[in-house]
Design a protein with these regions (language model features):
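Conserved class I S-adenosyl-L-methionine
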Residues: 126-134
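S-adenosyl-L-methionine
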Residues: 157-201
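Helix-to-beta-strand junctions that scaffold the AdoMet/dcAdoMet cofactor pocket
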Residues: 235-236
């Protein structure tokens, strides 16, 4: 991740991060050990306290924006202690772009082989459609839109989808090929199966618990497995899945088991690992886990 974000210090149950020109302190149970930079902690602009909420920057100074690679993102403190960016997801973006690029290239080759070509002899093929469930404020959606993918962005929160659309506008992607959908992820995926839709890739970042606009409560321990089965029915044969989670009980091995059971393809190779960020001196803060699968050779 370049420019806009840095993990400055961790310790005593808290993390200190720089988002653009703002320094933010937030608690996290994995932030063990002792703090090393007392001056940096004293300079925090915003502090999240579980009892009192946000302390620091006045409302007149909000929101603010940061540059992140090809994007410009709007940040603001939320009642859940977030700011609109999950920096640990940035490490997934190179793999995502590589997978989408590979799918686009294969689609182009298939179009050329079938004789579909443009005036200059270039292959003509629709870009792959990527489904992003629990898509939040749009980091992954916009990172893929930049390289020409068509993305279906689904989140159950109308204000969060509006936030993602503002990020698209700030990033010069207001006219990108993105469908913005306010809906429950399971309900939307079920309807897409009935419609016969297929996707070149599917991203999921499910919360531990949640409530959507249509169905009842979401519980990851009960609802993830059937949703993954539905997603497997939506995948093109050479598609991919990226599953991330921040739930303590869903470490990388469990995510891999859930994904393997849903995909059900012999010989499937699933890569796993932690979602984490690191300080400049190499101390790591683990914030979740991922499992990813691709139906085509890397």
């Amino acid at each position: 991740m370049s420019g806009g974000y840095a993990l400055l210090d961790v310790g005593d149950g808290a993390r200190l991060e720089r988002f653009g020109d703002r320094i933010v302190e937030r608690p996290h149970p994995a932030a063990t050990g002792r703090r090393r930079n007392s001056d940096a902690w004293a300079a925090a602009d915003l502090r999240w306290d579980r009892e009192r909420g946000w302390l620091g920057t006045s409302p007149a100074q909000l929101p603010w924006s940061i540059p992140l690679d090809d994007l410009t993102l709007e940040l603001r403190p939320t009642i859940a202690g977030q700011v609109g960016l999950f920096p640990e997801h940035a490490a997934m973006l190179p793999w995502l772009r590589e997978r989408v690029g590979a799918v686009m290239a294969r689609h182009g080759d298939e179009a050329a082989d079938s004789g579909e070509a443009g005036d200059a002899g270039d292959a003509v093929s629709d870009p792959p459609v990527i489904l992003n469930l629990f898509a939040a404020t749009g980091l992954a959606t916009l990172s893929l839109a930049v390289i020409g993918a068509t993305v279906v962005h689904v989140d159950a929160s109308r204000p969060t989808v509006a936030w993602a659309r503002r990020n698209a506008e700030r990033s010069g992607l207001a006219d990108a090929s993105v469908r913005w959908i306010v809906d429950d992820a399971p309900a939307f995926a079920d309807r897409e199966v009935r419609r016969g839709r297929r996707y070149g890739g599917i991203l999921l970042d499910p919360p531990s618990y949640g409530h959507g606009p249509r169905s009842g409560a979401w519980r990851i321990d009960l609802d993830l497995a059937p949703l993954l089965v539905t997603c497997a029915r939506l995948l093109e044969p050479d598609g991919f899945v990226l599953l991330t989670a921040h739930t303590e009980a869903f470490a990388a091995d469990r995510l891999a088991d859930e994904l393997a059971a849903a995909i059900g393809r012999p010989g499937s190779r699933i890569e796993t690992g932690p979602l984490r960020v690191a300080t400049a001196d190499g101390r790591r803060l683990e914030l979740g886990a991922f499992a990813r699968w691709s139906g085509a050779a890397s």
